[in-house]
Amino acid sequence: MKWLLAVLCVANWTVAATNVKQEAGLEAGRRAYEASDYVKAIQTLQAAAAQEPQNGDVQLLLAKSYLELQQHDPAIKSAEKAVAIDPQNSVYHEWLGRAYGEKADHAGWFSAISLAKKTRKEFETAVQLDARNYSARQVLIEFDCSAPGLVGGGEEKALPQIKQLAAMDAAEGHFAAGNCRRQKKDFAVADEEFTKALESNPKSAELIYDIGDYAVKRSQPERLLTVADTGEQVAPADSRGKFYRGVALVLKKENPGEAEGLLRAYSKTAPMRTGYPRPAAAHAWLGRLFEEQNKTEEATNEFESALRLDPKNKMAQEAMKRLKKS
């Protein structure tokens, strides 16, 4: 009997050690992902997937990592594996839809049609599986408000979804309504809905800072301050509040020292991730801050830094043209 107990103890220890090792692989991949080291994340997660091929969360994080590197085919493959592992997981379907959508955005028109249809199908499935998967509802609504009927879109499909979402969460509902109007370039109504969203106790930092991105493009400093205040209450560790507050101060031409400090802090800590303003944007706004103070050399340095990080940064491109003429 003692030898049997010993064998069972060894077996239990082996299983526990294996589980710890597998969990460690996923967590190591997550840490690399959070640090924006997507190459390392992929390498770590691939090893974890080999050890535990039925772990859908590993495949999901692999898909997200591939998407950050704009590697659409492997992202789709990983997301498809996640769905195959757990077909009832709403989040897996949502991210498979996102992967299809990203590839559609970079595909030729013929391939894009098929991919767009797949995108909507996955978003719809995600919502059917979990009515309170708000991010899935938001992307489904955005798809229907922006995509043509040829691929399954149509605002008439979005309106019932917006109504259902508003009944569950007022902030999410107002955001969805505003985002739909943004797709239609009806900015007056979008403004109203986004204001209501921020007043309705939003719980999602992604929702809040998406409104921040809109406010930057519309040059709305007061809304940006509200975004920063609300975002910092919901997610104090999220660095995006610094960026949007800094931009607001530049637009208002107030407290230049504070604006510089906020934008510099953000540029040093911002993750390179979808949904976050790139560090290049912070340098471009620093350039504008210095340009308005007639500090031409400092402004030029910041705009050049922005272009080194992102050669397509329009704000920095236009500023350099101005400065060369002056």
Regions found by a protein language model. Give the residues of each.
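Residue-level recognition of tetratricopeptide repeat
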Residues: 30, 64, 98, 105, ...
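Canonical positions in the second alpha-helix
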Residues: 47-48, 81-82, 125-126, 164-165, ...
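Helix-start (N-cap) detector for alpha-helical repeat units in TPR-like alpha-solenoids
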Residues: 21-22, 56-57, 90-91, 134-135, ...
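N-terminal leader/linker segments that initiate helical-solenoid repeat arrays
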Residues: 15-64, 68
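Register position in tetratricopeptide repeats
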Residues: 34-35, 68-69, 102-109, 146-147, ...
